[in-house]
Amino acid sequence: LDYYNSYVIQPMLIDVLSIMKKHEVEGADFYDVQLQRLIRYADQQEKMISPEGTYPVLGRSMGYRFGAFQVLAQVSWMKLLPEHIKPAQVRCALTKVMKRQLIKGTFDKDGWLNLGFCGHQPEIADRYVSTGSNYLCTFIFLPLGLQADDEFWTAKPEEWSSVKIWSGSRD
């Protein structure tokens, strides 16, 4: 298991299929199927974020940090979240993840990201990972493409799924 379906595979596939559909290229009919898969994966990702802002650390490329949530961020940016997931709960969940991971040691003395998952942990970096690879974590910022008055930004804070579930909420 790893997060490569979120880092690049599913997001890039939907982007390519979108262009294919726009230009009526053969195979573009797969767009609708893939879009439903992307939305389902975003739904699963939202539930993976614990009340504390942690999530399973698994697979390779752990140094990409919260870039693991590219699918959730992209589906939010596309405004295609499932009905039961509100944009504000995604905003709050992703913010909690970032606050949890951006601890002392995350940045070097010049302000560049250090290798690691939570702080400076070069030993977790795969041999193909460089300092530049760290910046795949910026995928989490895709919602910055939304307008400032978008519900994602303006709605009051809302608990995300695992917070509700672990508190015994029935909502």
Model-derived features with residue positions:
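Long, repeat-rich segments with strong aromatic
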Residues: 2-115, 122-149
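Extended hydrophobic packing segments that form well-structured cores
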Residues: 142-171
